[in-house]
């Protein structure tokens, strides 16, 4: 198993390898870090990091799966633990009976699916390890609808390149959102989970749906998913870096492990 303590150094190594001797190892320098041009170069390096990850790793490889006896007795809930908007509170009160997942954007057949409809579709159950960027990990069991199945049903456009997840929670001005490319969107372990450890997904863990993209770090596993949007360009969303934490604190967009 990959020790969570070596995840970030491995990814930083890949970034360094991709950008060669360009001097980006000086990223810790405050003067450079405040430079817009330097930050632009860093973002270019991140794109190369993503390419390096894809070349080195088998893009279809599965994340390790575990037995029930290996499940963590406590699975920490972090980030938003609830959502206080009137709409979400009403959905919780009626157990999401009137809630609908919207799937739109670059698709030919936009969908609006109830939780009952999602649960009636073919599902996948997996026991996997959640690795948080903060340094902790936990093993849990998830069941949900494969994202690839939903995208196929919606008629994904051949021009689409990314999938954006719009969430009910927010931190400050902007709502939480995340995104993945189509390789991860169609990975067999990428699901929209509606069950955790054999029980209905709890609010604190992102009810009604939580993205599970098992080969990426925890901040990519968006909670409270309300809408799935197919797009050809991440630059049109908020600050343009493909996710809330990517926009706010320059987390890597591709958080592969």
Over which residues does each language-model region extend?
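N-terminal secretory signal peptides
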Residues: 1-8, 12, 19-27
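Generic, well-ordered alpha-helical scaffold segments in large soluble proteins
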Residues: 16, 20, 150-153
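Structured, non-membrane catalytic/scaffold regions adjacent to prosthetic-group chemistry
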Residues: 32-257
């Amino acid at each position: 198993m990959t020790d969570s303590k070596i995840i970030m150094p491995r990814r930083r190594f890949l970034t360094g390898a991709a950008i060669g001797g360009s001097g980006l190892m000086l990223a810790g320098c405050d003067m450079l870090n405040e430079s817009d041009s330097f930050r632009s170069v860093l973002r270019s390096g991140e794109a190369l990091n993503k390419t390096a990850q894809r070349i080195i790793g088998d893009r279809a490889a599965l994340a390790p799966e575990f037995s029930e006896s290996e499940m963590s007795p406590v699975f920490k809930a972090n980030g938003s633990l609830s959502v206080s908007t009137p709409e979400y509170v009403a959905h919780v009160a009626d157990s999401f009976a009137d809630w609908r997942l919207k799937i739109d954007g670059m698709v030919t057949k936009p969908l609006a699916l109830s939780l009952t409809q999602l649960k009636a579709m073919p599902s996948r159950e997996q026991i996997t390890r959640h690795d948080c960027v903060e340094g902790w990990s936990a093993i849990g069991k998830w069941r949900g609808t494969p994202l690839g199945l939903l995208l196929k049903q919606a008629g994904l456009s051949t021009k689409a390149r990314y999938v954006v997840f719009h969430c009910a929670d927010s931190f400050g001005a902007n709502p939480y959102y995340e995104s993945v490319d189509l390789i991860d969107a169609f990975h067999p372990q990428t699901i929209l989970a509606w069950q955790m450890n054999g029980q209905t997904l709890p609010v604190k863990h992102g009810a009604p749906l939580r993205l599970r993209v098992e080969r990426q770090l925890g901040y990519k596993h968006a909670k409270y998913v309300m809408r799935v949007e197919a797009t050809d360009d991440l630059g049109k969303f908020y600050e343009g870096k493909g996710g809330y934490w990517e926009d706010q604190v320059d987390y890597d967009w591709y958080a592969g492990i």
